[in-house]
Amino acid sequence: MRFLHLSDLHLGKRVCEFSMLDDQRYILEQILSLLDSHPVDAVLLAGDLYDKPVPPAEAVRLLDWFLTELSHRELPVFAISGNHDSADRVAFGSALLAESRVYVSPVFSGPPEPITLTDAHGPVDLYLLPFLKPAMVRHVWPDAPIESYNDALACVLDHCSPDPAHRSVLVAHQFVAGAASCESEEPSVGGIDWVDAALFDKFDYVALGHLHSPQKVGRDTLRYCGTPLKYSFSEASQHKSVTFVELGEKGSVTIAAEPLVPQHDLRELRGSYMELTDRRNYEGTAVDDYLHITLTDEQDIPEALARLRVIYPNLMRLDYDNRRTQTRQELDAPAKAEQKTPLEHFADFYQLQNNQPLTHEQAVFCQQLIETIWKEEDA
């Protein structure tokens, strides 16, 4: 049985205020063409279908179009919500969609139930596990000792018992310890949301989403497929692809990657203003790519961004790297941290973990706690 493993579409994404919707449709059309030339039995979508919990209408229409195209090809789709998605919104209409063999993970309420497909080698059981936080799992099992993401996932999978005689596939969206991340993903502070790769050992293939770089974690069959597009300049050197997975008889798994070619690459350029505006250096190059340009001139160039965009219309970011900026970076880094109050440090941490700022009431409560702690220490 052959699968296409996709994740992290991040439909509706904006990079440096540039909308990615046209590029996303372009790459989805390319994926559909690959499916036409590389037939599969089902498509796995491992979370972060959208970039935000409340996606723009254009992003919703784009996903609707893509799922409809997959349905026209009579392909079952197995999709889960990721940390960027609203699980409730993604699950809307899931019972109706299932009648068209588009299976969407419900809002988490307990261990996933298998959905079974069959081929010449027998049954394949697919389990859909949306992005989990410890609080979600504690709500289902209030007496379980759940203090971490690892505890939460372990509890859920302890209640999930794949038939050892069947081939089993899990679609999930978590940080797995040992995987490499990049800056375009939601930051992890102190690794508190990582989970142990050994928790997935009972599954023949684990289709992971969350990390943007295609990679295996430990074994070949525990795998992130990565994003179909580059979403930050930390990904500039990556080669994006889609992952094809073939399950033979029990224990036999073959994995292959097919490269994707974007409408606009996302690249970094470096040099002096004179070098980058010299026609001999840019003629014949992809000047309409999404670019981060670093100028090495010692003096700022007046209206450099506007002038460079005459040649490079999709210039997203402009920086300088010279003696002045290097000195400023050395001086600013410790000063910025020292200037922040304890509440500001906690607010930064909270936003990183929850993708939303503290409310006024929460900030007041936290400040009261901080003051109480300081009073106790002074006493």
Predicted feature locations:
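N-terminal active-site segment of His-dependent metallophosphoesterases
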Residues: 1-68, 72, 361-372, 376
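Divalent metal-coordination and catalytic microenvironments
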Residues: 8, 28, 43, 48, ...
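Glycine-rich phosphate-binding loop signature in dinucleotide/nucleotide-binding domains
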Residues: 35-39, 119-121, 162-165, 284-286
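His/Asp/Glu-rich metal-coordinating catalytic cores
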Residues: 55, 84-218
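A short helix->loop->beta-strand "cap" motif at the edges of active sites that frequently abuts
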Residues: 72-77, 166
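Binuclear metal-dependent phosphoesterase catalytic core
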Residues: 112-124, 129, 222-287
